[in-house]
Structures are given as structure tokens and as C-alpha cells.
Amino acid sequence: MDLPEPVRLDCGRKLHPVRVAYETYGTLSPRRDNVILVCHALSGDAHAAGLAKTPPAESTRDGFGAADRDGTAAKGLGWWDGMIGPGKAFDTNRFFVVSTNLLGGCRGTTGPSSADPATGEPYGPDFPVITVADMVRTERAFLDALGIERLAAVAGGSLGGMQALEWAVLFPDQVDAIVSIASTPALHPQGMAWNAIARESIMRDSAWQGGRYYGTGAAPDAGMGMARMVGHVTYLSAPALADKFARRLQFADDIRYTLTEPEFEVENYLRHQAGSFVKRFDANTYLYMSRALTYFDLARQYGGGSLRQALAGVRARTLLIAFSSDWLYPPSGSEDIADALRDLGKPAEIHVIEAPYGHDCFLLEEARQTPIIQRFLGHGGQ
């Protein structure tokens, strides 16, 4: 869908035209009051559930072991298929679920690989630097164009959870509930550092060409692959890696004394993830999304440094789900949000699930999240 009006951005620029790629699941009620917006993480897209009409060459299902754990990834199964559908956490027998590709994306929504109307060429580094708030304003404009004024809920994990929180702050009168999973009120310095390493890996690849690699026949695949390796390590926990790979060798019964080949299973896994990712994701989009993650800070943006003040206007019921082994977005961040909301007398429910997979738990622990979300959406939470 092409938005009818320009999108105003935090950097001071206006972006137009803006196209938003989206998918929907379920049936919109006559009163248009059963809409749930689901928001994807850094490398996701609008295809959240079901089988893609045109299966992608590579799976878009992120998550440790999630890429083909049910044998359907090659068919293009949506990244949150286990959570969206009849009888699932986001029950399409009750709700009309909408999923969009984020502003700045590379899966159909306007981003750095889109044509700049001023030149007819891809924006590249001339695309404006965006924030999570810009993504949410774009979603709001998109829903306006669909004729949807109010949301029953906004839900997402990781960056998607940040968007849910941003919705509650920016549009307090337009969303009834939020479900923020494996998220945080602000990325902590360690997470910022890992993001910086990933971005540097891309920008130091000579094939990046200052971000103007489109149409040149070259792309920063080496740097992008390195960024993906870094990302995957941050998504996992040490016990999960040890359980899956231990120190098993990949191709031999003994070491080969080579510098260039992946001799251990864990090395081969990371190389495979890198190779798959560069086939389906744009390096500039990765840079823009990573920067938006780093900027996100509710207390700084809306509370003068106080999270409590930033959340003072929130009216949505809030469900927070965190995971014990998630060191990238640790449970303490969700606990801080819950504490601030409760101090303000606002309804907030938090669950910390004991699970070993690290940040990827939000994609892997669907069965344990489902009853929590169903109760929250069905019975008003706590």
C-alpha cells in the first residue's frame, strides 16, 4: 500500500512516497475493533504466518534451530506461524491480525534499496536515518489508510516488542493492550557494542562502497555475513550452544590444522547462517535497523531520563514476557517496565520464563508463551 501523505521523521525530514508491504490473517469485525498488529524483529518481514505464495530461496524464519525445525521452512512458513492462526496465541478465529514490513525494510516497504524520487536511483545512504518511533508512525499512517482507528493489541518480540512499547507511549488512546516479548526500554551498552561491531563489519567491507553498491554487481556480502555471525551469537546462550554443538568436529575425527576451513560444528553453523542471510537481506537495511535499535530509549525520549515519567501516559494493558537466559535483552529490562507501570497504578503483567536458548526463546518457546497470551487477551490480564 502506498501511503497518501508524507511520513514525518524524528530526524526532521519528511519521507514520500512510502510504500508498506503487509499481510493479514483472520477476518475484520464489522466494528473494526478486533485488530492486532504484530511487529517483526530486525531481520523479519510482513510474512508472519502461513505458507508464502511464492516460497523464498532461503528461510526467513530466524531463531536457533527454527530455520527448519518442522521441515516446512523451504515452503516459506511465516516467522511467527506457531503464534498466529486458529486457536493459537493470536487467535484468528477472534482477531484480525495485521503484519507489516518495517519502514527501512527490504521486503516490500520503502527503505534504502527503494528508488529515491529525486534521482530515480536507490536511496542508499541518502535514505534518512530512522527511529523506532518513525516505524510506529508509519504503521499508524498505514492503519489509517486501511480505515482502522483503534487496535485491540500490538505485539512483537525483540525490536517488535520495542514497537509495541512505542505504540503505548505515542498513541495511548488508540491501543487497548500491548504484548512486548524479549524486549527492553533501552538497549544496554553491551548490546550497543555488539550492534556497533556488526555495522562496522559491513561498512569496512570495500564492496559496501559507501552504501552505493546497488547496480554495481558487488555487495558487501563478507561484511554482512560477519554481522550475521555476530548477531547469531548474541541471540543464543552459552548453554544452548554447548548443548547443540559441544566441541564436535565438523568433517573429521581429528583436527586438520587449517586456518581457513570450519573444523568445528559451531563454526560451520555460523558460516551457513552468514551465507543464507546475505541472499535475502539488504546490508543497508541492516545498518538502518541496527541504528534504530541503538537509538531506542524510552526514558531519554519521553521522560527526561525517567522511565516512570516516560510511561506516565500509557493506558494500554501491558503484558511483558522475558526469558531467564536472554542476556541480550535481559529480564531486568522488562521488570523495570513492569515496576514503573505498577508504581503509576497501571495494569502490567510480567512473566519470566525459565528457558535455555537465550534471546531466540521468543521464537522457540511458542508453546509456553501461548497460554499466557491467550489468558491476557481473553480475560483482561492481571
Can you say where each PLM-predicted feature lies in the sequence?
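N-terminal cap/lid subdomain of alpha/beta-hydrolase-fold enzymes
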Residues: 23, 31-116
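Conserved acidic catalytic loop of the alpha/beta-hydrolase fold
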Residues: 120-126, 133-153, 162
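Conserved hydrolase catalytic core segment
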Residues: 150-193
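Alpha/beta-hydrolase-fold enzymes
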Residues: 174, 180-276
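Acidic catalytic loop of the alpha/beta-hydrolase fold
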Residues: 276, 296, 325-329
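Short alpha-helix in the alpha/beta-hydrolase fold that links the catalytic acid
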Residues: 301-307, 330-341
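Short beta-strand/loop motif that positions the catalytic acidic residue
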Residues: 314, 320-322
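Catalytic active-site module of serine/aspartate enzymes centered on a nucleophile-bearing elbow/loop
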Residues: 335-382
